[in-house]
Each structure stands twice: as structure tokens, then as C-alpha cells.
Amino acid sequence: MTKAPIAGNRTGRKLGQRVKNKKMKASSRQWLQRHINDPYVQRAQLEGYRARAAFKLLEIDEKYHILRGARRIIDLGAAPGSWSQIAAKVTGSTDEDIRVAAIDFLEMAQLPGVKILQLDFLDPSAPEKLMEAVGGTPDLVISDMAAPTTGHHRTDHLRTMHLCEVAAHFAIEVLGEGGHFLTKTFQGGTERDLLAMLKQNFRQVVHVKPNSSRAESVEMFLLAKGFKGRKAEGHAEEA
């Protein structure tokens, strides 16, 4: 069971620690103070994960079991790599037998058992390169992609929703029957066409807000379970 971290100094640092730096802007100082006092950040350091985001995936999996039985996983917007760490572990991926492919336009340090592509997912060559890297049909496509923020809520929402839609189209093109798709989204309304497409192609579509996602954050996750497969869609068109 993925439990919420307990406040304390298990990492050698007490919660409630203040950041003192007169040269730092107040907003930056507040962010850094919140970050170093975040129990999920401390737990990630303690358990060897690259980011607190690991617990978002673990919480979602605890309820919906999307990692169970996964043999190949594609991780979109992977940096710094905590989701890829989990993916490599559950698939048994090794450098000799790669079963996890990760992509991000940001540089990402190497991980055992993960083929990393430093490339914008919107690059036309990205889908083919990901499929070559993962070495077979994926059971799970996970996306933590979000567009760089501009400070304008509506613009940020639309840009991130575009990434969600592109990721969803990719998942439908590459997943094996019964596979799952998980993507980050922002509160503010999921595009109707995206939901309709996912419901047409997957047996279950739900919104998820894990406890490890900060309460003040507008992020949510959209989970599509049980890919129906492309053959059924083809038969429907013929009919």
C-alpha cells in the first residue's frame, strides 16, 4: 500500500525548515521552502526515486492496477525519470533486454534498462523511434507531459491538452489489446473530443487526483483502461 509520508526527520532534515537567502525572490524562496519540506520529496530521496512524481504513479497503480503484468512500457515526458524507474522495475527491463522507452526534450540521466530519447514528442520521427526503442508492442503508455507554462491559465491549459490529444492518438496506434493509457491533464475541462475518442477505444475512462498531487495544483490524470484493439474498429468501419 502506498502510504502518505509521515512528518519527521527520516532524511536528516526536519519539516518546517526555513530557507534563508536575502538575494532570492520571495516567490522563489517560498517554492524552495515548500519543496524541501515536502514529505513526498523527502520520501523520494529516501527510497531512491528521482522525483516525488513516482508516488503519483504508484498511487494510481494501487487503485487501478495498470502496472500489473506490463511487459513493455513507453514513458512520455519522462524527465527526470521517476516513472521510468518504476517501469523498468515492473517489466524487468535490462540493458540487454530493453522493455522501457522514455522520451523528453530535456536531458535525462541514464537509467538501467531504459532507452532514453532526448527528443520533442511532437517531432514527426518520435513515434517510430519510440517503437524501435521499446522493441515490441507496449502494454502501457504513460505521459507526464505538460507544456511550459506562460502564466496565462487558458493558454497553458490548451497547450497541455494538445499534448494529451497527441499522446492519446499515439497510444491508440501502438497499444496492444487490453493495454492502458495514463496522461497528465489540467483541471479546467477535458476536451470533449478527447474523452469521446478514449471512451470509444477503451473499456474504462476515469479522472484521477492522487493524494501525492499537491492540493493547490490544477493537475489531474486521465486514465484509459482496457484498450479494445484496432481490429474491432476496422470491423466497425466495414459494417
Curated annotation (Swiss-Prot):
InterPro entries, A to Z: RNA_methyltr_RlmE, RNA_MeTrfase_FtsJ_dom, rRNA-MeTfrase_E, SAM-dependent_MTases_sf
Q: Entry's SUPFAM superfamilies?
A: S-adenosyl-L-methionine-dependent methyltransferases
List positions binding S-adenosyl-L-methionine: G81, W83, D104, D120, D144
Reaction(s) catalysed (UniProt annotation): uridine(2552) in 23S rRNA + S-adenosyl-L-methionine = 2'-O-methyluridine(2552) in 23S rRNA + S-adenosyl-L-homocysteine + H(+)
Q: What are the alphabetically sorted keywords of the record?
A: Cytoplasm, Methyltransferase, rRNA processing, S-adenosyl-L-methionine, Transferase
Q: Which GO terms describe its molecular function?
A: rRNA (uridine-2'-O-)-methyltransferase activity
Gene3D superfamilies of this UniProt entry? Vaccinia Virus protein VP39
Q: Which domain of life is it from?
A: Bacteria
Question: In the UniProt record, does the keyword Transferase occur?
Answer: yes
* Known EC number: 2.1.1.166
State a GO cellular component annotated for this protein: cytoplasm
Q: Active-site residues?
A: K184
Name the residue ranges with Basic residues bias.
Answer: 11-20
Q: Where in the cell is it found?
A: Cytoplasm
Q: Where is this region: Disordered?
A: 1-20
Predominant cellular place of this UniProt entry's protein: cytoplasm
State the similarity comment. Answer: Belongs to the class I-like SAM-binding methyltransferase superfamily. RNA methyltransferase RlmE family.
What this protein is reported to do is described as:
Specifically methylates the uridine in position 2552 of 23S rRNA at the 2'-O position of the ribose in the fully assembled 50S ribosomal subunit.
Q: What is this protein called?
A: Ribosomal RNA large subunit methyltransferase E
What species was this sequence derived from? Rhizobium etli (strain CIAT 652)
